[in-house]
Amino acid sequence: MDKLDLVNDGLDIIDFIQKNQKEIQKTYGRSSIQQPSTKDRTRAWEDFLQSTSGEHEQAEGGMPKNDGGTEGRNVEDLSSVTSSDGTIGQRVSNTRAWAEDPDDIQLDPMVTDVVYHDHGGECTGHGPSSSPERGWSYHMSGTHDGNVRAVPDTKVLPNAPKTTVPEEVREIDLIGLEDKFASAGLNPAAVPFVPKNQSTPTEEPPVIPEYYYGSGRRGDLSKSPPRGNVNLDSIKIYTSDDEDENQLEYEDEFAKSSSEVVIDTTPEDNDSINQEEVVGDPSDQGLEHPFPLGKFPEKEETPDVRRKDSLMQDSCKRGGVPKRLPMLSEEFECSGSDDPIIQELEREGSHPGGSLRLREPPQSSGNSRNQPDRQLKTGDAASPGGVQRPGTPMPKSRIMPIKKGHRREVSICWDGRRAWVEEWCNPVCSRITPQPRKQECYCGECPTECSQCCHEE
């Protein structure tokens, strides 16, 4: 069935619908003409393929079944000798080429055409390589060893020898190849799949700031972060073209900030560190306190207060000395008022007057320096000066035992051009937030102050 027949059938269907439009039952805008069932369409396709190819029988599973012999084949369609001297002539192919009729279906996976360029080198597009300039085309022969025979065009190459192939050999070769590919269902022109070599080592991932500080790192956590000095250039990220100008600008900005990041060091680095930076309890080192217990002088809070974390305290106990790295800023204090929620509470009067910064409370003994008080009033006496601090429960008249503490959180922030570390404290009952934000107590049992932050100074 060619294109003209298909077009005529379509026109006949349109005429039938137009003539019987009034008789067709209307079902809410949908046509009552139903499509044939899948079984009917499958049977119609089987009949079409059998009538077109004439050499395959459809099996029950839908796969073509080859008879394996030459009785059901039309030998004249496969090959024919047109010249009297025995040379190869033009053979009629049972394969429909896409170049001639792109709408037809290619029935066989094997192209068996050998075409002379009788019209001045115009190529029909058959074969794996066709070149009108050369005047000859390749032909995939039916030999079982996979040889390729090049049939020259005698008109373009008159001195080429004439090749004679017995008709029986050609029939056996073509039938053998067609049986082989038809039974296997393979495409001879397909390119074999070559998998990639998975054993080739890939490039190492780029260094990210989370690797050094242990926050936000996914994957293998068994490897400890590197100790000692950290290359700060690896976490400087500049997206502007003026890198030199931006670098000078942010170096000046970091120089103004005295907040520093504390990382762990090994005892071997102790010789190159000033002893004035040794942080720890004087009682642990055999020294006496410069002031009596409970009589600490009030210190004036300055912006260059140095915060230390548990990593620093652990390094002191192991014999290491903390080392400070400049040019990384911790911008949020433990109870800072930069959060918009806290500022809104202050405007509403929930936190009247008073400073939001933490002060060091009196200490009863040196051994209980890092331990929170187990009996605190959550009323006016819960905070120094009778000031209600953000993130604390509402005042109550009874004494409530403290069952929960605080959680120290660290976040590495990045504004597109630089990265810095922010650290803050939240009650244990509050949610863990990806951004630095002071959360309020939900259970009413958390302390009003973080004992770790209060006893650091």
From Swiss-Prot:
Binding site for Zn(2+) 1: 406, 425, 450, 453
Gene Ontology cellular component terms for the protein in this record: host cell; host cell cytoplasm
Region (Disordered): 26-104, 193-403
GO biological process, one term: symbiont-mediated suppression of host cytoplasmic pattern recognition receptor signaling pathway via inhibition of MDA-5 activity
Positions of Zn(2+) 2 binding: 429, 441, 443, 446
An annotated Gene Ontology molecular function: importin-alpha family protein binding
First-listed, main subcellular location of the protein, grouped into a coarse class: host cell
Subcellular location: Host cytoplasm
Alphabetical keyword list: Host cytoplasm, Host-virus interaction, Inhibition of host innate immune response by virus, Inhibition of host interferon signaling pathway by virus, Inhibition of host MDA5 by virus, Inhibition of host RLR pathway by virus, Inhibition of host STAT1 by virus, Inhibition of host STAT2 by virus, Interferon antiviral system evasion, Metal-binding, Phosphoprotein, Viral immunoevasion, Zinc
Top-level lineage group: Viruses
Compositionally biased intervals (Basic and acidic residues): 296-317
Acidic residues bias spans: 240-252
UniProt cross-references to Gene3D superfamilies, sorted A to Z: 4.10.80.340, 6.10.250.2490
Positions where Phosphoserine occurs in the chain: 257, 350
Keyword check for Chloroplast: no
Biased composition (Polar residues): 28-37, 77-96
InterPro entries to which the protein is assigned, alphabetical: Paramyx_V_Zn-bd, Paramyxo_PNT, Soyouz_module
The protein's assembly and partners: Interacts with host IFIH1/MDA5, DHX58/LGP2, STAT1 and STAT2.
Further comment: The P/V/C gene has two overlapping open reading frames. One encodes the P/V/W proteins and the other the C protein.
Task of the protein: Plays an essential role in the inhibition of host immune response. Prevents the establishment of cellular antiviral state by blocking interferon-alpha/beta (IFN-alpha/beta) production and signaling pathway. Interacts with host IFIH1/MDA5 and DHX58/LGP2 to inhibit the transduction pathway involved in the activation of IFN-beta promoter, thus protecting the virus against cell antiviral state. Blocks the type I interferon signaling pathway by interacting with host STAT1 and STAT2 and thereby inhibiting their phosphorylation and subsequent nuclear translocation.
Family that this chain belongs to: Belongs to the paramyxoviruses V protein family.
Protein known as: Non-structural protein V
